[in-house]
């Protein structure tokens, strides 16, 4: 009977000790959590503000490549030059001036014959190519020409169309305007958050500017390094700022 009493007594002691340990641990944990909230409160509130605007490309770069494979380099050069002339005529007839067209240098390389995975050292054909690049502010003209380039290809000219790159030259002007609007947006957000908990927004203690994002109008793309879509004439330009405010 005494042995049973001793066992129950030891269980009671262990239970009390465990309760003390748990209470101490919880107390320490709550103290740490409380300290964390206090630190966050003393640092104020950090919010992200954003602003966007619609923009239209005012510059375009369009590169076309005329490429031909022929038995000899000479034959390839002749055909490529003929193709370049046809492409140039198409561009000029469509409203592009000669001054807006740049012809790249001719490039060629020999295609070797291979047998059983080994080169025989014999050249069986030559690939010759030349770039035709348009640089202009006539973005609408280039858009129309790019849609009709198929007529040149249908005529037998071997053209590789890399597609126009539509660019905005006024980004340096848009950036400060957008950042100012993003700052206002950040303050509105901070005031809404602090008002909900009975506080007020104080002075700005830190500002970090984000990268500019240039995207298609319906895009949600956002890259850490910044996005710059060149596939469309119409674009959306977005700026963000991260702002820390004191709170009261």
Enumerate the language-model features and the residues they cover.
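Short, charge-dense linear interaction motifs
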Residues: 2-248
């Amino acid at each position: 009977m005494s042995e049973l009493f001793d066992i129950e007594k030891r269980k009671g002691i262990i239970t009390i000790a465990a309760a003390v340990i748990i209470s101490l641990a919880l107390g320490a944990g709550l103290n740490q959590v409380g300290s964390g909230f206090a630190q966050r409160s003393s640092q104020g509130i950090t919010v992200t503000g954003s602003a966007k605007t619609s923009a239209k490309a005012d510059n375009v770069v369009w590169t076309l490549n005329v490429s031909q494979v022929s038995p000899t380099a000479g034959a390839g050069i002749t055909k490529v030059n003929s193709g370049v002339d046809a492409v140039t005529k198409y561009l000029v007839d469509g409203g592009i001036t000669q001054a807006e067209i740049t012809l790249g240098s001719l490039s060629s390389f020999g295609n070797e014959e291979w047998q059983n995975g080994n080169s025989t050292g014999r050249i069986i054909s030559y690939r010759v190519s030349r770039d035709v690049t348009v640089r202009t502010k006539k973005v609408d003209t280039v858009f129309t020409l790019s849609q009709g380039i198929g007529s040149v290809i249908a005529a037998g000219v071997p053209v590789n169309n890399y597609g126009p790159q539509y660019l905005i030259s006024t980004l340096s002007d848009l950036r400060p305007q957008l950042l100012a609007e993003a700052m206002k947006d950040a303050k509105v957000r901070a005031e809404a958050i602090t008002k909900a908990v009975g506080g007020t927004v104080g002075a700005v203690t830190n500002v970090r500017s984000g990268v500019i994002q240039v995207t298609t109008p319906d895009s949600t793309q956002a890259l850490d390094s910044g996005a710059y879509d060149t596939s469309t004439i119409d674009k959306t330009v977005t700026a963000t700022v991260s702002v820390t405010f004191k709170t009261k």
